[in-house]
Amino acid sequence: MTNALLLTTGAPTPMPADDKQVKGISPFDMSAVSHVEELGPVGAGEPMEPYDASPALRIRHWNELVGVIRAFLVEAQLPDTIGLPDLVDYLTVKSRNPAVGQHITTPVNLTAWLFMIVRALQPRIVVESGVFKGSSLFTMRCASPRHKMFAFDVDFSWLTHRFDAVDYRERDWGLDDVRAEGPTDLCYFNDHVNNCLRIRQAYERGFKHLVLDDTPDLGEIRAYRYPAVPTVSMIVSGKFQDGDAVDWVWQGQRLRYTFRSEHTFGARELIDHCHPIPALRRWTGLQDSNAYYVKLK
């Protein structure tokens, strides 16, 4: 009976302590023979990445990741100029980034995408709205140090690092007049403000390339107190109609969002094409995001 229960429930039936000692049963007996070697405890303060690998395997793994990045750039009609040296550069920048991986900063895998998109576009101007501790700001500044960079937030007191070559503006992006100077200039919005409003504002200021974070669809919205609704995913899917409501629970609080077409500012008609930013956790072991790359007309 015990073996049958193990196979159907996936967990061993509790046994008296003395029976366990006699039969030598442990919770891991169903794993049969383990090929994982124990190397001992981690030292106090020892930095640990999600994994390490032998050098040859690491290079093969990185090359596989570069292939994923390049495939997305092709799909998004961006310059396909990224190679292994760019990934190595990103990893070096990531290791120096004082805010990377901190609580509620830009997900680490999205910082990788921002680095690669900036490298591919080589913009004259990069705008970030919603800086917080500066993880993504640090990443994009280091991706292409030649571009002008504008950082917008209503409070810069959380910043972990300041660059002399960044123009910090402590106000809402919507109240400013910074404009694109070239066709490859980029805006990154991580401010939890209506995606559609930001698209309209960027379009009116001449920007063609956008990355927008916090763009959940129905199955992802429960992770947010302040999703940037209506989000890109909501307007491009075509399934939302006026009055459609979404309810969810966030940290014990019931929330509701009701879709209204007047809140979209005609953003769908301004988009040439857009693409959800792919997940990279399989390769990095780190956090992904609900973000979109958007190309405007």
Where do the PLM segments sit?
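A short alpha-helical cap/connector motif
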Residues: M1-L186, V193-K297
